[in-house]
């Protein structure tokens, strides 16, 4: 023995005496052990461990290797009086904790003393712990941090056959440390099913001559029960003449039938053979399927098979359960319960039951031998789940689920020859098919060379192209910079502070980036919650139902964001949890609110872990007096900003076929002029055969899913010309339902729900109503006084006379302006005006004085009077008031506790609503009866061309602050009212008072509102009014005709509002299949990155954005949707965790410019403006070829981008980089809290300035070769903006910037010749609009807006658009 060896032995003896002797005295090391099979191999195992640096131990499940081998080593250390420190890895947290608990019980010591565990943030250990169970990730992180494993005497890696990415990388690290600084540590590799030779070969060690492969020890376990194997070719009695298509893995309809028959065979025949009728309950059938869709299909086929068995004695009593990873915890628990006597449990499971979950009473296994495997295309970063044949190792593992407590059978639904000769022995390692981002970051933290050289040491090294693409993605994310010590490297890059944090967090890197940006933008707490929720499988329940969708809308609170839905749900749960009386209250609340309690608890645990890890890297919320504070509404916008930054370049543009203008025109024609924001339609109803109003109740039932309270808020209309049924949802989107569920924008929540109802079925879901035979229908409808039948016209609905139509106060076509008083304000887009002309004032005062005069006695209604919707009464202006006014009954509600009926009434002369008991109503009879025939004295109005500011109200509804300000400015006051248009009896107006700024403009100036385009139908009406008013000013005859037209039509008719009637059930003998409901506002999304631009896009079904509608149809600028994750299904992209971005013009391009690695501005031919932007990693400086073409993102601009914008964006990018900057020898930024506080305040200042800046609209022009980079002369980063030179001197961070400064625009002024041409062109368009000539066959093009105009009305409407007016303003045309 050499002197060095003697020193080492002496050190070990001292260490053992100091650190182990107290433990030998404290704990019992001579325990009596159980008789597990592995006990017979104990001496051999210990001898091999002593003699070899690495051993491979293979043994079947249940042989005892996981619990006993570490204890063998522990006890041997006691007998040999040696130091030991053992660590054992498990692939799953629950396994590590439960095994540690079991071993501590066997050793009769408290958990956390001699035996402990560590999983994520949960740890149970102490200085005494010598046997530690942990997850693979915990050991890997520990070894990366310490860069040695000499701290451990024994490293035991269990379940290595699973070959997950972390395990493969851990094997690299362990082998590397064995060969360098940890040669004395013993390594034991263990698994139930393992390709032992490959592992033994991988861990071979050099000797004097050649190499020594790691020895393999096999432990056999004599099975107590037999499991017989059967294959598809053994099932002759069940088979039809059908051959499996092995080239295309999947399940045909025939094979579902085979499996269903097999279940029946198991239930009938086998139980007779085994006498199961004598058992307390019948053993379970476990069916392995590849995914949730297949589980659903198998469930359907099984139940259908049962329904076809007529004889009840032959019908099996099956209790069918589903089992998969996203199943709520309370549903998973049912799988483990014993079935009722005489019942047989059938479990339809994914591979979760293969190893993660054990069902004890399984006798029969039906295995389709399929699995769903995740593959990631590293060039696009799109992941896809492929169905493929399982490996033999998987099938053996599945077989092991049976034969635990009784004999069993496994039926493999493949031919024996295929199983034995063509199925792989083991599944391909994850490292070859899954994302490598986390692995490469861990490789960078190891500091042992470039990532590709480290990963080349893997058992199955990934392709170099996959490593290259992953490095490019990490550079795009900001985890790596483009260079290594200043030199560009394609396969490597220096690690940034952002990259270090990403490597420390147990999350997808994009989610980690969301947290980092949350820190920069002062929303760290919220970003952590959203990130943790996105990392969970799904905290929401009932996603495949309209109720679940409504609940998700409720949690999203009008934000249109899945991330914000997670945030709101978690905060509500946490608050409720603090107040809840007991666990059952909490469980029932979460179920009621469609939340998964277990997922929320796991999420809370993960939030604690994330915060703990962030504290270790110096990232925590600043708490000083100067810290940034956001209002709740600002916070919604900022959260969307950081999502746009974190999930760049997953940007999608919602598109309507043919463009916005065409969509608006089509909406108008498809709905017959009805409002697309609250109307849906069905097709397939033949009005010549059927009388629509008889089936109104059925139509409402289809859309209300049994909630009859919703029927009052639906109006059903029938169109004879198109054979369509229209359903309008009453009340606006901002008057949301009691659940508070709504979406951003103007579209009613019930329109979203209606389309969701259709999409939950097939894409063209057919809805059925039952109808009467025509003769019966005519007879019944006539009897009910619903109308009458005409041979020439068919059914004619009942109509009512509108008397005194000439007294209507709704602005007539000749009224350009009027003087009115504001009588009631609901919000800026809904208020009521009463004209102040003498005639109207006299009528109003007459009504008011008589209703409140002692000379007129108001009579009560009889107690048994039947009130009806639409009836006019006299009612007190408010509860308990003695002032009465005319009111119309709108809807009612029965109060069960008191028996009262409460009515919502609308006051016709004031414009407000109230809820009153019917005892408060008085008759309008006798001398007051004439009042029933006078139209209301107020009309509904909306401020024209404005909408809520997207910054203070991202939900698109008016805030309480803006409504209160509007009330202060207007309520009870008199204004000059300029009438823009009247649509559906609602006037779009401008409110003016003397020389003051119009109210519309003032609200924009105060930042409460932003500009809004008027709707297509509003512009149509505006054009018609302007032309008619122009004709009146030029022609006295026209003026006379228009003024007196109303007097010639004193009797007007409208379809009467009919009470809902239901024909007798026995007369509904026919069926009509309807298609719908449909909305003309339905849109699709398109990707903006090169690799996705030609692929159709779907939003995942459980997203709040799974129904995409054009929520602001009048707005012409592009909206943007951001997805956290994107995966491929066939040729289709599926977006998960989607968020609709704020309705701010230019928001998408602004976000791309703020968060992209670099960009290039594309200009028009004259270089007078930027028409599109190209962002990405840039191009090769020599060839001009894109460095990462698949991720290049192109966006066209529809707003004007200025040098001021670039200056502000550069200031923001520089500040973000400053916050994240570390010098090369630093791992954490060295700023004090005050410096960070100031920098974050600057971030707030810059982002608010960028978002609030009002930009002019411009026409969309696509630059040629949108995705091609153009070689340009290198710009010095310091020249990117005038202010950046000073910054560069102050603090040099641009050697490794994540967000380098963008180049200046360098635009040229518009030439005088071009200006002159555009002005002449404008004059020509305005002249043409005044004529009645026909336009050329293919229309004309507005040269300023690049818009084709096919008809004169289109031309006139275009001239009113903000785009055209902004363009006129830019060229100074008057």
Curated annotation (Swiss-Prot):
GO terms for cellular component: cytoplasm. ATP binds at residues 59-66. It catalyses: ATP + H2O = ADP + phosphate + H(+). It is found in: Cytoplasm. Keywords: ATP-binding, Cytoplasm, Developmental protein, Differentiation, Helicase, Hydrolase, Meiosis, Nucleotide-binding, RNA-mediated gene silencing, Spermatogenesis. SUPFAM superfamilies: P-loop containing nucleoside triphosphate hydrolases (SSF52540), Tudor/PWWP/MBT (SSF63748). It is an enzyme of class 3 (hydrolase). GO terms for molecular function: ATP binding; ATP hydrolysis activity; RNA binding; RNA helicase activity. Belongs to the DEAD box helicase family. DEAH subfamily. This is Probable ATP-dependent RNA helicase spindle-E. It comes from Aedes aegypti (Yellowfever mosquito). The gene is spn-E.
């Amino acid at each position: 023995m050499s002197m060095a060896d003697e020193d080492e032995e002496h050190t070990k003896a001292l260490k053992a005496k100091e650190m182990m002797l107290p433990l030998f005295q404290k704990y019992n090391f001579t325990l009596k052990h159980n008789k597990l099979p592995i006990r017979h191999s104990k001496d051999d195992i210990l001898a091999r461990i002593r003699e070899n640096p690495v051993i491979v131990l293979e043994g079947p499940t249940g042989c005892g290797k996981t619990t006993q081998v570490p204890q063998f080593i522990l006890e041997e250390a006691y007998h040999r009086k040696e130091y030991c420190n053992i660590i054992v890895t498990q692939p799953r947290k629950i396994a590590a904790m439960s095994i540690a608990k079991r071993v501590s019980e066997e050793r009769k010591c408290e958990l956390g003393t001699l035996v402990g565990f560590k999983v994520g943030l949960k740890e149970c250990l102490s200085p005494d712990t010598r046997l530690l169970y942990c997850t693979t990730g915990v050991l890997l992180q520990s070894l990366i941090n310490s860069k040695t494993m000499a701290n451990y005497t024994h490293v035991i890696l269990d379940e290595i056959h699973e070959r997950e990415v972390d395990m493969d990388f851990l094997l690299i690290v362990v082998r590397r440390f064995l060969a360098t600084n940890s040669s004395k540590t013993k390594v034991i590799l263990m698994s139930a099913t393992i390709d032992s030779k490959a592992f033994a070969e991988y861990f071979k060690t050099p000797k004097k001559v050649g190499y020594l492969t790691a020895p393999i020890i096999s432990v056999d376990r004599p099975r107590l029960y037999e499991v017989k194997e059967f294959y598809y070719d053994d099932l002759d009695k069940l088979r039809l003449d059908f051959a499996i298509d092995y080239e295309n893995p999947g399940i045909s309809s025939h094979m579902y039938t085979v499996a269903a028959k097999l279940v029946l065979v198991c239930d009938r025949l086998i139980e007779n053979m085994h006498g199961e009728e004598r058992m307390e309950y019948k053993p379970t059938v476990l069916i392995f399927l590849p995914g949730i869709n297949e589980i659903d299909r198998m469930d359907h086929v099984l139940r259908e098979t049962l329904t076809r068995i007529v004889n009840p004695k032959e019908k099996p009593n099956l209790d069918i359960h589903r089992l998969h990873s996203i199943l709520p915890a309370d549903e998973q628990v049912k799988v483990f319960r014993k079935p009722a006597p005489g019942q047989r449990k059938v479990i339809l499971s994914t591979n979760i039951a293969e190893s993660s979950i054990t069902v004890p009473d399984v006798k029969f296994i039906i295995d389709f031998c399929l699995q769903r495997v995740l593959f990631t295309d590293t060039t696009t970063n799109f992941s896809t789940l492929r169905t493929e044949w399982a490996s033999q190792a998987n099938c053996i593992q599945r077989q092991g689920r049976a034969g635990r407590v009784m004999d069993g059978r496994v039926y493999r639904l493949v031919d024996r020859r295929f199983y034995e000769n063509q199925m792989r022995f083991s599944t391909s390692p994850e490292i070859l098919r899954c994302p490598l981002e986390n692995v490469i970051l861990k490789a960078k933290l190891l500091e042992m060379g470039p990532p590709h050289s480290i990963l080349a040491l893997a058992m199955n090294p990934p392709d170099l192209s996959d490593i290259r693409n992953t490095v490019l993605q990490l550079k795009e994310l900001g985890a790596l910079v483009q260079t290594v010590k200043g030199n560009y490297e394609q396969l490597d890059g220096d690690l940034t502070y952002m990259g270090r944090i990403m490597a420390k967090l147990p999350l997808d890197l994009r989610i980690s980036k969301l947290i980092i940006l949350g820190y920069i933008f002062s929303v760290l707490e919220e970003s952590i919650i959203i990130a943790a929720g996105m990392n969970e499988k799904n905290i929401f329940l009932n996603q495949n139902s309209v109720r679940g969708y409504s609940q998700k809308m409720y949690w999203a609170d009008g934000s249109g964001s899945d991330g914000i839905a997670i945030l709101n749900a978690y905060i509500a749960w946490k608050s409720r949890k603090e107040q809840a009386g007991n666990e059952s209250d909490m469980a029932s609340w979460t179920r009621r609110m469609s939340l998964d309690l277990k997922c929320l608890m796991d999420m809370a645990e993960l939030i604690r872990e994330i915060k703990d890890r962030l504290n270790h890297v110096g990232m925590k919320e600043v708490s000083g007096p100067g810290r940034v504070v956001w209002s709740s509404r600002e916070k919604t916008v900022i959260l969307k900003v950081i999502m746009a930054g974190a999930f760049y370049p997953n940007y999608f543009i919602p598109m309507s076929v043919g463009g916005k203008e065409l969509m608006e025109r089509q909406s108008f024609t498809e709905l017959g002029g009805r409002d697309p924001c609250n109307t849906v339609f069905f097709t397939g109803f033949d009005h010549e055969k059927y009388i629509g109003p008889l089936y109104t109740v059925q139509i409402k039932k289809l859309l209300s899913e049994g909630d009859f309270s919703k029927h009052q808020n639906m109006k059903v209309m029938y169109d004879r010309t198109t054979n369509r049924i229209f359903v309008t949802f009453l009340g606006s989107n901002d008057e949301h339902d009691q659940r508070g569920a709504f979406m951003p924008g103007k579209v009613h929540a019930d329109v979203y729900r209606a389309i969701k109802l259709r999409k939950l079925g097939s894409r063209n879901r057919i809805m059925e109503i039952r109808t009467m035979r025509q003769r019966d229908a005519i007879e019944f409808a006539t009897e009910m006084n619903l109308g009458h039948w005409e041979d020439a016209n068919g059914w004619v609905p009942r109509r009512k006379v509108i008397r005194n139509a000439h007294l209507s106060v709704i602005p007539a076509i000749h009224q350009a302006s009027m003087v009115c008083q504001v009588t009631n304000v609901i919000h800026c887009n809904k208020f009521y005006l009463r004209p102040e002309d003498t005639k109207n004032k006299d009528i109003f005062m007459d009504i008011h004085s008589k209703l409140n005069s002692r000379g007129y006695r108001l009579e009560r209604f009889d107690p048994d009077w039947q009130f009806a919707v639409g009836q006019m009464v006299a009612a007190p202006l408010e509860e308990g008031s003695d002032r009465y006014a005319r009111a119309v009954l709108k809807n009612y509600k029965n109060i069960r506790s008191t028996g009262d009926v409460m009515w919502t009434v609308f006051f016709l002369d004031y414009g407000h609503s109230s809820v009153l008991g019917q005892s408060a109503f008085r008759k309008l009879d006798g001398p007051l009866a004439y009042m029933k025939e006078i139209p209301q004295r107020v009309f509904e109005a909306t401020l024209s061309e404005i909408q809520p500011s997207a910054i203070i109200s991202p939900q698109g509804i008016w805030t309480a602050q803006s409504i209160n300000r509007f009330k202060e400015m207007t309520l009870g006051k008199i204004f000059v009212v300029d009438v823009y248009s009247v649509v559906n009896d609602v006037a779009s107006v401008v409110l003016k008072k003397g020389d003051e700024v119009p109210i519309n403009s003032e609200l924009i100036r105060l930042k409460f509102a932003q500009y809004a385009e008027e709707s297509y139908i509003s512009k149509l009406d505006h054009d018609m009014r302007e032309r008619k008013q122009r004709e009146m000013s030029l022609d006295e005859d026209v003026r006379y005709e228009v003024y007196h037209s109303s007097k010639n039509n004193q009797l007007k008719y409208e379809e009467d509002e009919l009470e809902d009637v239901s024909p007798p059930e026995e007369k509904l003998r026919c069926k009509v299949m309807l298609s719908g409901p449909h909305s003309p506002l339905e849109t699709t999304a398109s990707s903006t990155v090169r690799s996705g631009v030609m692929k159709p896009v779907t939003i995942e079904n459980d997203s709040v954005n799974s129904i995409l509608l054009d929520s602001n149809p009048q707005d012409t600028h592009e909206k943007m949707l951001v997805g956290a994750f994107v995966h491929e299904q066939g040729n289709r992209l599926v977006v998960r965790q989607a968020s609709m971005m704020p309705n701010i013009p230019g928001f998408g391009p602004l976000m791309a410019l703020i968060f992209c690695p670099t960009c290039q501005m594309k200009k028009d031919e004259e270089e007078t403006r930027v028409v599109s932007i190209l962002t990405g990693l840039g191009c090769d400086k020599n060839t001009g070829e894109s460095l990462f073409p698949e991720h290049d993102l192109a966006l066209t601009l529809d707003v004007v981008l200025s040098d001021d914008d670039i200056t502000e964006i550069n200031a923001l990018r520089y500040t973000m980089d400053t916050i994240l900057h570390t010098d090369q020898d630093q791992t954490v930024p060295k700023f004090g809290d005050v410096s960070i506080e100031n920098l974050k305040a600057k971030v707030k200042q810059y982002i608010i300035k960028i978002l609030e800046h009002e930009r002019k609209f411009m026409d969309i022009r696509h630059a040629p070769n949108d995705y091609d980079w153009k070689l340009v002369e290198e710009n010095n980063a310091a020249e990117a903006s005038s202010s950046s030179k000073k910054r560069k001197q102050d603090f040099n961070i641009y050697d490794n910037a994540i967000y380098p400064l963008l180049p200046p625009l360098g635009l040229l002024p518009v030439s005088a010749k071009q200006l002159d041409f555009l002005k002449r062109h404008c004059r020509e368009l305005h002249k043409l609009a005044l004529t009645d000539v026909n336009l050329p066959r293919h229309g004309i093009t507005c040269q300023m807006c690049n818009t084709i105009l096919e008809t004169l009305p289109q031309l006139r409407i275009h001239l009113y658009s903000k785009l055209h007016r902004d363009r006129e303003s830019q060229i100074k045309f008057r």
